């Protein structure tokens, strides 16, 4: 690995500064410095030199520091991990004495990390290495990092070029693909009358002649049998105009293929009738579950997605002319049945999803093993021993409910993605992954110190499951580009799986190919029936507004509300999230407590979790409850804070955002990390100026200073100052609040709707279905490798955790 930036400093007039700075790091207490540590240390160095920190454009050393992700202090040398560009990493050892640069390999870096935590034992043999790179060597690969996350666009270009370069083979593939589609025993698209690709081309032209004399709006049922005699079955369209348009696209594709024509044609093929979404953990339901442990944005995401998916699928099937077959989509969300459901419907096998025709929550119980464990909710960190048998049982249930195998399986989060892998492998269907959040990037050093964290988090299982599922998936949906490969100054969630060590367990030399076309950025939407601008007064219910206004500001109910407001007329500073460490509501409360300027202008209102530790069985939630009380007392926030420990129905949460907006309040999302940020979309579309964490998805939702603001939740004073600056601007110009409010609403409506999301998702599923059918890529070797990791790494550790559960 060439260390270009490091070499440039060594060969420049800043060489002495580099040596002096390196010497300071060498003598410091920290052996492992992350980017923030490095930037702070460099700022201290510049201050000691009585000069400002130079911008990266003006100093080679400053540029090196800016692009350095980690420094490991190792006796007489420093190991520099530099990320000069997105998705590219360089590792070098710098000898402090004479500034000699020695490039390092990834295995050498992983050994060094092991040595740092005293888990390096070369005399006992090598550690197992995971390397998936050989399985991607013969697959098409994106070249430019800017195009990562645009996998389907790349794939369309690749496929259309193959159609052009090798027309005979690829026309045969397309012909074979058109012949395989059926619905409930009915042949679709083409029948046995069309005998070859050449014959297909001839019959398409003949069909276009037949249709040319018919009125464009004539229904398909009127000419169905005439087309059938030419070899065409249902699936081309519902009117003359639609059928003609689809056949013209196919004609163009056969004669002069290009990527846009290919996507337009494949996205019209009726091939998706049954979709299974997998989300085992938490309390998956429609009422009384949000705010429970492990139950939040993912549940909202999936339910909203399903409603929009069904609507889009119905529309697509109708446009395809499958009304003559009475074709209807069916969607199932597969989750876990929890026998002790605590008043929810999570012990009910089937639950119809509101607002749909044929979409259901299907709950399958974990096998019993130890009833003291399996009869109750199980933390997402403890769920791993039950997933394989859950997948076996769920396969039978899915077949029974669908009457068929699903056409597409969508996994959600680490556990759902692993089950999706097991099911897709058994059922031989397309697998899509949605991570929502990869825990490895949320918990600092979670892989390096996995053994210390194992009792609580079981990361050895989760990270192994992630590696298996992400490599096995046919395609992966991420909400943002940075979820895959980060930003110029921070690594992405998937990028963090490229190489890492699990000391004494395994080394990941190459864990994922970031340039694979399997990655696609498809942001979610927001439910516009529930969340809409505060000034849409005719859509708001006055009774709800009055009830919730009292709940937020004045109601005395110690069972579910803590705190009172001495001056309820102050501008509300609002946040709503689960009470866990990563969501960091205690950080917001402490920032509020430290800032007199915020307290003078605002009241803090939190909707979060429970009020009493006795009511929670979640360790993180209990710790955060205790911490929040301690902060309230430490900073004497009595009379300035309201903490509502309640679970709100979705409709109430929508109205609460609007009530806060009525009072020209603001919304703060202070998470230490947020994969996407649905609450940010909900707040913005409601009209609330929104402050979102700069760590994660909000970086792509919010445009800083235009339609919201970034905050750094690790610097509490800075976070408070950012909010205060906006409030001061509002004091100077009352229109400032309106400006940000309006811009936030426009941002959501232009980019984050479920219709955009679902249209894209269905198109992706069809393109990847065609790719898997027609390409010569053999994934079987990759899949066998993933199965080996499952059986040899994952399963023994899952069985050990199960043995532990049996003793409880």
Curated annotation (Swiss-Prot):
GO biological process, one term: sucrose metabolic process
pH dependence: Optimum pH is 7-9 for sucrose cleavage with ADP as substrate.
InterPro entries xref list: Glyco_trans_1 (IPR001296), Sucrose_synth_GT-B1 (IPR000368), Sucrose_synthase_pln/cyn (IPR012820), SUS_EPBD (IPR056736), SUS_N (IPR056735)
This protein's UniProt keywords: Glycosyltransferase, Transferase
EC number: 2.4.1.13
Catalytic activity: an NDP-alpha-D-glucose + D-fructose = a ribonucleoside 5'-diphosphate + sucrose + H(+); ADP-alpha-D-glucose + D-fructose = sucrose + ADP + H(+)
Top EC group: transferase
Alphabetized GO MF terms: sucrose synthase activity
Gene3D superfamilies for the chain: 1.20.120.1230, 3.10.450.330, Glycogen Phosphorylase B
Record has Glycosyltransferase as a keyword: yes
Self-association and partners: Probably a homotetramer.
Functional summary from the UniProt entry: Catalyzes the reversible conversion of sucrose and a nucleotide disphosphate (NDP) into fructose and NDP-glucose; although the reaction is freely reversible in vitro, the physiological reaction seems to be sucrose cleavage. Unlike characterized plant enzymes prefers ADP as a cosubstrate, whereas plants prefer UDP. Its preference for ADP over UDP suggests it may directly link sucrose and glycogen metabolism.
PANTHER family in UniProt: PTHR45839, SUCROSE SYNTHASE 1
Family statement: Belongs to the glycosyltransferase 1 family.
Protein known as: Sucrose synthase
The species this protein was found in: Thermosynechococcus vestitus (strain NIES-2133 / IAM M-273 / BP-1)
